[in-house]
C-alpha cells in the first residue's frame, strides 16, 4: 500500500507533473516525473516526500480491470519510491495494453521508464 504522505491527490499537482515534468513512454504506460526542488534544505528541515498518482482510463478496461491495474502500479511504485529524488511528483498513466499485461510486464516497463527519466537510459 502506498503511504498517505506519498499519494498525489490534488488536480494542480497532477497538472504540474504532466505539464512541467519530463515524460517517458513505454508500450504499457507513460511516466511523468517532476523532480523536487534542487535547493539544499536548511538544517533541521526534512525533505518533502516523493508523491505518486495514477491515471487509468476506461480504455484500459472495465472497473475490475482498471482497479487491478491501479493496485499493481501502486505496489510497484511503492517499492521504487526510495530511488526517486525527494519532493518529486510522479504520475503513471496506464495505456490500453496495461489491462492485459501481467505484473512482470508492468514492472519491466515502469523500471525502463524510470531509468530513462532518472538519466540512466537511452531512448
Curated annotation (Swiss-Prot):
The keyword RNA-binding applies. One of its GO terms (molecular function) is 3'-tRNA processing endoribonuclease activity. One of its GO terms (cellular component) is ribonuclease P complex. It catalyses: Endonucleolytic cleavage of RNA, removing 5'-extranucleotides from tRNA precursor. The keyword Lyase does not apply. Belongs to the RnpA family. Consists of a catalytic RNA component (M1 or rnpB) and a protein subunit. RNaseP catalyzes the removal of the 5'-leader sequence from pre-tRNA to produce the mature 5'-terminus. It can also cleave other RNA substrates such as 4.5S RNA. The protein component plays an auxiliary but essential role in vivo by binding to the 5'-leader sequence and broadening the substrate specificity of the ribozyme. This is Ribonuclease P protein component. It comes from Streptomyces bikiniensis. The lineage of its organism: Bacteria, Bacillati, Actinomycetota, Actinomycetes, Kitasatosporales.
Amino acid at each position: 500500500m502506498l503511504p498517505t504522505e506519498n499519494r498525489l491527490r490534488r488536480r494542480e499537482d497532477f497538472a504540474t507533473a504532466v505539464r512541467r515534468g519530463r515524460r517517458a513512454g513505454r508500450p504499457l504506460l507513460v511516466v511523468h516525473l517532476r523532480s523536487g526542488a534542487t535547493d539544499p534544505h536548511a538544517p533541521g528541515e526534512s525533505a518533502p516526500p516523493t508523491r505518486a498518482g495514477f491515471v487509468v482510463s476506461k480504455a484500459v478496461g472495465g472497473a475490475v480491470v482498471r482497479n487491478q491495474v491501479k493496485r499493481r502500479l501502486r505496489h510497484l511504485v511503492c517499492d521504487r519510491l526510495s530511488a526517486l529524488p525527494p519532493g518529486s511528483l510522479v504520475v503513471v498513466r496506464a495505456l490500453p495494453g496495461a489491462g492485459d499485461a501481467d505484473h512482470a510486464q508492468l514492472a519491466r516497463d515502469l523500471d525502463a521508464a524510470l531509468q530513462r527519466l532518472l538519466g540512466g537510459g537511452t531512448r
